[in-house]
């Protein structure tokens, strides 16, 4: 049974596609590609059908990550097929939990940086790099990479628990 993760930011052109690309690479490197699917979406549909921001694509490519992406808006009906919904900041977390049709679905929503032990008790938001320069995208990637290690460990535990 496939474990499904969806990363969510505002417009699905910067942070969430970056998190999706990094996490997919981690999943493949861990040999879990046949068991875990990663996807992304935005809380809004302003960029629906567009590719990722060119700065996101450039930073990912410079760090060896691939990305084939078309932006889309998160839909309430997706909760039923997802195991984990990963929000990139507290605003997304609140919006997604409000959208969740059940308490069980709301419990599926977590902040990405909550998986990074280095920020325990600190600011768990991944800042939106959209209005800044390349440095903001590099910083975003660093945060995503740091949290992806803990996220992979948590997902691996869930996947192995299902197999037991």
UniProtKB/Swiss-Prot annotation:
Catalytic activity: O-phospho-L-tyrosyl-[protein] + H2O = L-tyrosyl-[protein] + phosphate
Pfam families the UniProt entry points to: LMWPc (PF01451)
Gene3D superfamilies noted in UniProt: 3.40.50.2300
InterPro entries referenced in this protein's UniProt entry, alphabetically: LMW_PTPase (IPR050438), Ptyr_pPase (IPR023485), Ptyr_pPase_sf (IPR036196), Tyr_phospatase_low_mol_wt (IPR017867)
EC number: 3.1.3.48
Recorded superkingdom: Bacteria
Keyword tags: Hydrolase, Protein phosphatase
Active site feature: 9 (nucleophile), 15, 128 (proton donor)
GO molecular function: protein tyrosine phosphatase activity
PANTHER family reported in the protein's UniProt record: LOW MOLECULAR WEIGHT PHOSPHOTYROSINE PROTEIN PHOSPHATASE (PTHR11717:SF7), LOW MOLECULAR WEIGHT PROTEIN TYROSINE PHOSPHATASE (PTHR11717)
Function field: Acts on tyrosine phosphorylated proteins, low-MW aryl phosphates and natural and synthetic acyl phosphates. May be involved in the regulation of sulfur amino acid metabolism.
Family stated for the protein in its record: Belongs to the low molecular weight phosphotyrosine protein phosphatase family.
Protein name according to UniProt: Low molecular weight protein-tyrosine-phosphatase
Annotated organism of origin: Streptomyces coelicolor (strain ATCC BAA-471 / A3(2) / M145)
Gene: ptpA
């Amino acid at each position: 049974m496939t474990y499904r993760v969806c990363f969510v930011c505002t417009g699905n052109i910067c942070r969430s596609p970056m998190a999706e690309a990094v996490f997919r690479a981690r999943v493949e490197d861990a040999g879990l590609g046949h068991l875990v699917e990663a996807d992304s979406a935005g809380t809004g549909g302003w960029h629906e059908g567009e590719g990722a921001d060119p700065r996101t694509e450039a930073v990912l490519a410079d760090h060896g990550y691939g990305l084939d992406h078309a932006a889309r808006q998160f839909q309430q009906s997706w909760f039923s097929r997802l195991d984990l919904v990963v929000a990139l900041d507290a605003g997304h977390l609140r919006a997604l939990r409000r959208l969740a049709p059940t308490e069980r679905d709301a419990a599926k929503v977590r902040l990405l940086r909550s998986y990074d032990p280095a920020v325990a008790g600190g600011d768990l938001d991944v800042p939106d790099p959209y209005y800044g320069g390349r440095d903001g995208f590099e910083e975003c990637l660093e945060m995503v990479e740091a949290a992806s290690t803990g996220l992979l460990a948590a997902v691996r535990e869930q996947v192995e628990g299902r197999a037991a």
